[in-house]
């Protein structure tokens, strides 16, 4: 029954927004596509901070190029995941082909738009998307100005030699401050004010008149050669319950047709193309894909793990004359959680669901693990805490699966006295005190450089927040007359994933923005904090943290967990322990059973005998018995 529900959820998501094209419509699209030369191709992306209007601008571009019709039903067209629509953020980069007739030149153009995420946790999606583009729209909210992730994504696009078109969005808002936004773009990115385009993605102001012509004029066409042997860069992949593994590819050189035999450069496995086509905005089957185009192919791939992002796909027999493309650097997971099925009997089906979802999000690392408290599960690695939260939501929405997720932890490095190093991602693997004293030279934790932008009036509160999270100030910049401040702090990643972004939004009244990048490991005084029930450690609840946090967190843990443990027939002692030292203790008194209820009030000796027997029985139960903790208690505590 659960498997049927899972398939229903997947199919409903897949077909909810599918555009059905007749054979006549498809033929017309293919004829138009064939008549456009590669010099009239424009592949571009949109660079922006979260909530600056990327998805809305994408909708207007699709609308003005005839891909979709205007209307409320066509909102966030490229945000195809249910979790994207609920949260109002882009998570997966999506591509769409558009046709645009330029009346100035009387020429037809083929545009490939890649709508990318803005949040730092999905930077790997952004990086892969830029590899298929010749340019990008640098989008800035007229009311908020340049934000932290605008800066980070700008430098990423700039480093990949993309032609950037500065665009100020939301000019129709009463709170819009266009001169301030222009000044920030000019001073922060050194882009000429004359090149800035002002638009309203919501109303469509200047999108058709100014922005589309600028894309044609300023963004260069792809540089591939149609007569060279076919090679394509594998940009993304996903699992379709009807087609199997689907690959999103950028055709760098040559032509590929339905029925062609292709080979993977990384695995050496050969496949026959069952179907291929363009995204318009959903899959539209075509006869072939040419140089410079971005589209999908269905290779009949049997194993999900064979779809390796950054792989080069080429024709069978042409391996010796086809140069392999530079792939992508594998994203490095920096936040790890333990994941366990809410219902232990569904481990096998949940394992299949997680494996399929990982195919669509290759930045997730996956490893089996088991817990004494929660049973069989997985150790999952993510790019950030939002990434982990989104993965859990997608699993629930797309597959109907329920997970228990432990508190996030970051990778720590152990340096031994003999020169060896070990990275641990599970608190259960943290060395005990005796090993630390004899064989360990140092313990290190990951640090990041956090870039924070905020209005000057909240500067004091934000500096205090950073210092309370062991931040070290490296730079403070006042952005001219705009009233904005840019802060740079070195900070332990462990503090950043502990809802630092939520705390920043709170102290800055929602105006602060955050971006960060990894800067390596530093020696640190870190210890493992355990929750102990009647002398037995609960492995799923252990966490590694800095010594300065231990007492505060330990007291909070013990007090909080007491709320979720039901009273037993014997006394339950809850302790928070670090380095074999008890930090905090809470006691749940034994549930009393009235063994005297049936006795006569005058039978004193019998009463004493039964009470002594009850006391001895409870003592024995405490020494040999296991405390019964239900799954709901763990879930409630982990949601704290």
Swiss-Prot record:
This is Translation factor GUF1, mitochondrial. GO terms for molecular function: GTP binding; GTPase activity; mitochondrial ribosome binding. GO terms for cellular component: mitochondrial inner membrane; mitochondrial matrix. It catalyses: GTP + H2O = GDP + phosphate + H(+). The keyword GTP-binding applies. It is found in: Mitochondrion inner membrane. The gene is GUF1. Its main location: mitochondrion. Belongs to the TRAFAC class translation factor GTPase superfamily. Classic translation factor GTPase family. LepA subfamily. It is a peripheral membrane protein. GTP binds at residues 48-55, 115-119, 169-172. Residues 1-26 form a transit peptide. It comes from Lachancea thermotolerans (strain ATCC 56472 / CBS 6340 / NRRL Y-8284). Promotes mitochondrial protein synthesis. May act as a fidelity factor of the translation reaction, by catalyzing a one-codon backward translocation of tRNAs on improperly translocated ribosomes. Binds to mitochondrial ribosomes in a GTP-dependent manner. Keywords: GTP-binding, Hydrolase, Membrane, Mitochondrion, Mitochondrion inner membrane, Nucleotide-binding, Protein biosynthesis, Transit peptide. It is an enzyme of class 3 (hydrolase). Its EC number is 3.6.5.-. It holds the Pfam family EFG_C. Residues 39-223 form the tr-type G domain. One of its GO terms (biological process) is positive regulation of translation.
């Amino acid at each position: 029954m659960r498997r049927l529900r899972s398939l229903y959820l997947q199919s409903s998501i897949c077909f909810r927004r599918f555009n059905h094209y007749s054979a006549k419509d498809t033929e017309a699209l293919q004829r138009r596509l064939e008549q456009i030369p590669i010099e009239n191709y424009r592949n571009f992306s949109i660079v922006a901070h979260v909530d600056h209007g990327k998805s809305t601008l994408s909708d207007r571009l699709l609308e003005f190029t005839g891909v979709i019709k205007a209307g409320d039903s066509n909102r966030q067209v490229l945000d195809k995941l249910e979790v994207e629509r609920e949260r109002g953020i882009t998570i997966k980069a999506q591509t769409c082909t558009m046709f645009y007739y330029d009346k100035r030149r009387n020429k037809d153009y083929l545009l490939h738009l890649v709508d990318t995420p803005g949040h730092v946790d999905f930077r790997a999606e952004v990086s892969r998307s830029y590899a298929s583009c010749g340019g990008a729209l640098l989008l800035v909210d007229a009311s908020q100005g340049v934000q932290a992730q605008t800066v980070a994504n700008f430098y990423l696009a700039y480093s990949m030699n993309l032609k950037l078109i500065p665009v100020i969005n939301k000019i129709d808002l009463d709170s819009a401050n266009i001169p301030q936004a222009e000044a920030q773009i000019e001073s922060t990115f050194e882009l000429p004010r004359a090149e800035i385009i002002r638009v309203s993605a919501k109303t469509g102001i200047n999108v058709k008149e100014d922005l589309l012509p600028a894309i044609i004029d300023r963004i260069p066409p792809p540089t591939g050669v149609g007569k060279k042997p076919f090679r394509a860069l594998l940009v993304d992949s996903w699992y379709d319950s009807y087609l199997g593994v689907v690959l999103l590819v950028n055709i760098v050189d040559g032509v590929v047709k339905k029925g062609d035999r292709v080979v993977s450069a990384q695995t050496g496995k050969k496949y026959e193309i069952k179907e291929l086509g363009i995204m318009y905005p959903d899959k539209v089957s075509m006869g072939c894909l040419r140089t410079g185009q971005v589209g999908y192919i269905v290779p009949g791939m049997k194993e999900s793990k064979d779809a390796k992002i950054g792989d080069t796909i080429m024709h069978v027999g042409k391996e010796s004359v086809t140069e392999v493309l530079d792939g992508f650097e594998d994203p490095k997971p920096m936040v790890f959680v333990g994941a366990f099925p809410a219902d232990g009997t569904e481990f096998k089906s949940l394992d299949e669901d997680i494996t399929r979802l990982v195919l669509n999000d290759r930045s997730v690392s996956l490893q089996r693990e088991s817990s004494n408290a929660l049973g069989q599960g997985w150790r999952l690695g993510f790019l950030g805490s939002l990434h982990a939260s989104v993965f859990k939501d997608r699993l629930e929405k797309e597959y109907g699966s329920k997970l228990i997720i432990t508190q996030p932890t970051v990778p720590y490095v152990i340096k031994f006295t003999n020169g060896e190093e070990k990275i641990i991602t599970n608190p259960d693997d943290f060395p005990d005190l005796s090993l630390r004293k004899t064989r360990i030279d140092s313990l290190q934790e990951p640090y990041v450089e956090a870039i924070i932008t905020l209005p000057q009036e909240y500067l004091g509160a934000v500096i205090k927040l950073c210092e309370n999270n062991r931040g070290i100030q490296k730079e403070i910049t006042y952005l001219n007359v705009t009233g904005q401040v840019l802060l740079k702090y070195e900070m332990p990643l462990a503090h950043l994933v502990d809802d630092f972004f939520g705390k920043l939004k709170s102290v800055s009244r929602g105006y602060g923005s955050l971006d960060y990048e990894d800067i390596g490991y530093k020696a640190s005084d870190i210890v493992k904090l355990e929750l102990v029930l009647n002398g037995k450690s609960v492995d799923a609840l252990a966490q590694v943290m800095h010594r300065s946090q231990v007492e505060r967190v330990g007291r909070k843990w013990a007090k909080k967990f007491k709320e979720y443990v039901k009273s037993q027939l014997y006394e339950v002692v809850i302790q928070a322990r670090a380095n074999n030292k008890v930090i905090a203790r809470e006691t749940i008194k034994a549930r009393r059973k009235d063994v005297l209820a049936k006795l006569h009030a005058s039978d004193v000796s019998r009463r004493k005998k039964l009470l002594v027997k009850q006391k001895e029985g409870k003592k024995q139960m405490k020494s040999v018995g296991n405390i019964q903790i239900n799954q709901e208690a763990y879930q409630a505590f982990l949601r704290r």
